[in-house]
Amino acid sequence: MITLLFYSGECMEISNTYQCTTEVMKSKFIAILFPIDDPDLFKKELAKIQKEHSKARHVVYAYRIDNKTKSCDDREPKGTAGRPLLELLLKKDLNKVALVVVRYFGGTLLGAGRLLRTYVQSGVNVLKEASIE
């Protein structure tokens, strides 16, 4: 697969959608990284993902569109999901990009620390899939 990255000012943008699955203690985390340039379009894409994964326990996300950033923990403990994903996007200087992680609960509580590490690892894994390391 050819990965297309290009610079917009000082930030990188992506042109494709990437997906990667991580499993921890029977919970499945599906990370989806995709280009987005409008918050309203993001809402539509998020709704599609939520519908496709309607049996998932959580759908957390972060996005950056120019100077606008947003993140959501979707009922996970505060600060364990959305914000760390946003920090990944900012650290990699990515712009016009969204990172959504869908969690299917595996029956075992992970605890805040392991939960945070797993969401971050899911984000790192999909960034590697997109050749952004």
Regions found by a protein language model. Give the residues of each.
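Glycine- and acidic-rich phosphate- and metal-coordinating loops
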Residues: 63-64, 95-105
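Short hinge/gating elements
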Residues: 70-72, 102-108
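Signal for well-folded cores of large energy- and translation-related assemblies
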Residues: 50, 54, 89-94, 120, ...
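C-terminal regulatory domains involved in ligand/effector binding and gene-expression control
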Residues: 2-80
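Glycine- and Gly-Pro-enriched alpha-helical subdomains that act as flexible
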Residues: 101, 109-133
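Conserved mixed alpha/beta catalytic, RNA-binding, or beta-rich assembly cores of soluble enzyme
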Residues: 73-78, 82, 86-88, 115-119
